[in-house]
């Protein structure tokens, strides 16, 4: 009898232990298999479920390097999703990088998903799908700090996608049409669309959002039939598909240069790619530095292309023609810029007298790469265009500290602002869905420019990325100043209100959607958390000047 009672007691204790352990490990069942995650706490100490390192595609290695992603196969055992995957193979492009600039792995196509504890919750939550920036060359979805977003009732998703030549090499033919990185994003989006219901997310309320190359990627998903129907709205932060750095020129020429650097024959595309597929990934990544003429400029040697070959292109026409032809996905869109976008990449040299002097002495040679017109202005006009731009923005005298503000404005206008207005105007004119625009000029205690410059704390204004990084970057978002905390919450409210309701709300400010027929450009100016207002500008980004430069870009057929 005693042994029987003991057996019951042990059985009961075992059941309790099993139940407790089971409760400590959140689980979901998806179409590709069961997943076990773990619990984390948000910034305000709210418990949420974390599932990190979920594969959404098969590993693109060996003969699958440079090829479109392949859907992930089902797994039979429970997948332990408690650790982030490796970042994608990349060449780091920041002054803070010391020693080896190459890091990552080709086996990197993974998703991280975060969701408030479900507790048998029935209403499905809106989903925010983050696409990281990094000039299509570096960074990772792993860097996204979700803890602030997990104070809200949304599901947060961050992805990795192939970068640099691994994600954006193009031979301009059937062998490697290109856009593998964008196709990775689309496959990840499809996996989320098909499986997010298991995590408590609503597949019909997915908001894609991204910054810089991530913002341009968001815009590209509006333009691709591959992604149509997989999301409900989007936010492009500091990047659109019209930006010069978001459209790769002379891609086959760059592919051959990479082949030559890897000592592969370049007279036969198929044999060149076979050779490149046999070369060590780290050596290929290291070669990205050979495509940058001055410092890290141009900063996007490998990026999106128009695919003229292949049976399943991501895009087969230029972004401007896709929109103008009415082939753009018609759902709401928000796009905005910050006041000093050009601090990327100007922060690398504006605090350095030696580099400014070098820029002064070699302006005519450097300008086509710094301002990304090397391929869109004929070679015999490079010097003339470089001088014209310099005379307008920098006037007379040497390039030195006195010209820093003008340099930043010049780079902001050319690389971000001009094409931002052009893109939102055209999309608002073609689509029925609303387009909202904003301009952000709040400088927090810390800035991305500190990272880009290698530690300089000089206040040159609001840098590219300062807005989103105040909410998503572990270093910058860990703020204590009351003003920064207030702005942080305002931005979180902005992003999540759009995801939840489909209309952006910023502290009760009046924010009408863009009227594309208005000759003046109107946008919401976020000055600080108490000063938010609509502004009008009839010469935004000095567009009257830039119209005089004959760039072979964003031309209608």
Curated annotation (Swiss-Prot):
UniProt keywords, alphabetically: Allergen, Disulfide bond, Glycoprotein, Hydrolase, Secreted, Serine esterase, Signal
Compartment(s) of residence: Secreted
MF terms in GO: carboxylesterase activity
Glycosylation sites: 145, 374, 478, 528, 542
Key word tRNA-binding present: no
Catalytic activity reported: a carboxylic ester + H2O = an alcohol + a carboxylate + H(+)
InterPro entries found in the cross-reference section: AB_hydrolase_fold, CarbesteraseB, Carboxylesterase_B_AS, Carboxylesterase_B_CS, Type-B_Carboxylest/Lipase
A GO-annotated cellular component: extracellular region
EC number(s) reported in the record: 3.1.1.1
Tissue expression profile of the protein: Expressed by the venom gland.
Signal peptide residues on this chain, from the entry's feature table: 1-21
UniProt keyword Ion transport present: no
Disulfide bonds: 88-108, 264-275
Active site, UniProt feature: 212 (acyl-ester intermediate), 341 (charge relay system), 464 (charge relay system)
Domain of life the protein comes from: Eukaryota
Family: Belongs to the type-B carboxylesterase/lipase family.
Protein name: Venom carboxylesterase-6
Organism encoding this protein: Apis mellifera (Honeybee)
Lineage: Eukaryota, Metazoa, Ecdysozoa, Arthropoda, Hexapoda
């Amino acid at each position: 009898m005693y042994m029987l009672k003991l057996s019951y007691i042990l059985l009961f204790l075992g059941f309790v232990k099993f139940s407790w352990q089971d409760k400590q490990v959140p689980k979901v069942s998806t179409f590709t298999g069961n997943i076990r995650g773990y619990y984390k706490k948000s910034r305000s100490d709210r418990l949420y479920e974390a599932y990190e390192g979920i594969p959404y595609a098969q590993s693109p290695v060996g003969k699958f390097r440079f090829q479109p992603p392949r859907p992930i196969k089902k797994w039979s055992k429970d997948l332990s999703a408690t650790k982030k995957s490796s970042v994608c193979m990349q060449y780091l492009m920041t002054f803070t990088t010391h020693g080896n600039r190459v890091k990552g792995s080709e086996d990197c196509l993974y998703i991280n998903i975060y969701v408030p504890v479900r507790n048998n919750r029935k209403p499905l939550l809106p989903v925010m799908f983050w696409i990281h920036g990094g000039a299509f060359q570096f960074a990772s979805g792993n860097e996204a700090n979700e803890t602030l977003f997990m104070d809200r009732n949304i599901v947060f998703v961050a992805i990795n996608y192939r970068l640099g030549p691994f994600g954006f090499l193009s031979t301009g033919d059937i062998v490697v049409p290109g856009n593998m990185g964008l196709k990775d994003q689309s496959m990840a989006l499809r996996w989320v669309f098909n499986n997010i219901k298991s995590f408590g997310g609503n597949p019909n309320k997915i908001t894609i959002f991204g910054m810089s190359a991530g913002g341009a990627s968001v815009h590209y998903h509006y333009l691709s039939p591959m992604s149509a129907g997989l999301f409900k709205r989007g936010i492009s932060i500091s990047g659109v598909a019209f930006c010069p750095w978001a459209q790769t020129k002379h891609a086959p020429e760059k592919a051959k240069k990479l082949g030559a650097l890897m000592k592969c024959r370049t007279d036969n595309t198929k044999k060149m790619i076979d050779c490149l597929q046999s070369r060590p990934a780290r050596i290929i990544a290291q070669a990205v530095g050979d495509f940058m003429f001055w410092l890290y400029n141009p900063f996007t040697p490998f990026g999106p292309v128009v695919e003229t070959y292949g049976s399943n292109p991501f895009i087969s026409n230029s972004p401007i023609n896709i929109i103008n032809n009415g082939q753009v996905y018609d759902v709401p869109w928000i796009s905005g810029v910050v006041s000093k976008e050009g601090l990327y990449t100007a922060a690398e040299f504006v605090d350095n007298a030696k580099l400014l002097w070098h820029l002064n002495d070699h302006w005519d040679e450097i300008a086509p790469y710094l301002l990304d017109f090397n391929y869109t202005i004929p070679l015999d006009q490079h010097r003339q265009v470089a001088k014209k731009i310099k005379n307008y923005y920098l006037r007379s005298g040497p390039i030195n500290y006195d010209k820093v503000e003008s340099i930043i404005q010049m780079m902001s206008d050319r690389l971000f602002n001009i094409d931002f207005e052009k893109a939102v105007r055209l999309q608002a004119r073609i689509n029925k869905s609303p387009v909202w625009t904003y301009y952000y000029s709040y400088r927090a205690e810390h800035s991305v420019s500190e990272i880009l410059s290698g530690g300089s704390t000089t206040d040159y204004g609001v840098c590219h990325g300062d807005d989103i990084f105040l909410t998503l970057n572990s270093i910058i978002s860990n703020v204590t100043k009351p003003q920064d905390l207030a702005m942080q919450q305002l931005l979180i409210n902005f992003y999540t209100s759009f995801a939840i309701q489909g209309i952006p709300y910023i502290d009760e400010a009046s924010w009408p959607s863009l009227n594309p027929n208005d000759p003046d450009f109107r946008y919401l100016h976020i000055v600080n958390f108490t000063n938010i207002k609509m502004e009008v500008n009839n010469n935004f980004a000095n567009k009257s000047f830039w119209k005089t430069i004959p760039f072979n870009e964003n031309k209608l057929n």
